[in-house]
Amino acid sequence: MSEVRLPPLRALDDFVLGSARLVAPDPCDPQRWCHRVINNLLYYQTNYLICFGLGLALAGYVRPLHTLLSALVVAVALGMLVCAAENRAAVRRCRRSHPAACLAAVLAVGFLVLWAAGGAGTFLLSIAGPVLLILVHASLRLRNLKNKIENKIESIGLKRTPMGLLLEALGQEQEAGS
């Protein structure tokens, strides 16, 4: 296995401006929609990481303690999901067949814990808000030829990225190559 590397930052023109083609996905074809989201998450992962970081920085500036608590709670919930999926076949099957529900469950657990601790608003601003914006962009952005080539290289194992590892942990590695 090759070393894990972050792909280059995609141009703003490619990401959201001029050449970016944004089209609503077909809700009647969830498989194709899922492939679009996964492939866009892989291709634009550096841009998404920056967007997520900006959301965390903004919330961290406003409420630093609640932002750290939010990040910790979500990391623990995600770690528990991955650990449970590695040890229990039923959880692994659920994670693979219902990835959106698993992500929603992780975010819901994080929200409930932080609501009890008084940091629900910060959680929504720092974690859930950027994740929602990233998923909306990944759903709307049509793939281009360069995107498809990069995703093929990732899927055959010639290149490893942090998003690829995260998708594997969430049980989506078989989807990424499609």
UniProtKB/Swiss-Prot annotation:
Q: Is Transport among the key words of this record?
A: yes
Biological process (GO) annotations held by this record are:
protein transport
Which UniProt keywords are present, listed alphabetically?
A: Endosome, Membrane, Protein transport, Transmembrane, Transmembrane helix, Transport
| Superkingdom of the organism of origin | Eukaryota
Q: For side Extracellular, which residue ranges? A: 63-64, 120-122
Q: Is Transmembrane helix one of the keywords UniProt gives this record? A: yes
The stretches that face the Cytoplasmic side, renumbered to this chain, are 1-41, 86-96, 141-178
Entry GO CC? endosome membrane; membrane
> What topology does the record note for this protein and the membrane?
Multi-pass membrane protein
Tell where it localizes.
Endosome membrane
Segments traversing the membrane: 42-62, 65-85, 97-119, 123-140
Give the multimer and partner information. Interacts with CCR5 and GDE1.
Give the protein's biological function: May be involved in ER/Golgi transport and vesicular traffic. Plays a proapoptotic role in cerulenin-induced neuroblastoma apoptosis.
Family per similarity comment = Belongs to the PRA1 family.
Q: What is this protein called?
A: PRA1 family protein 2
Identify the coding gene: PRAF2
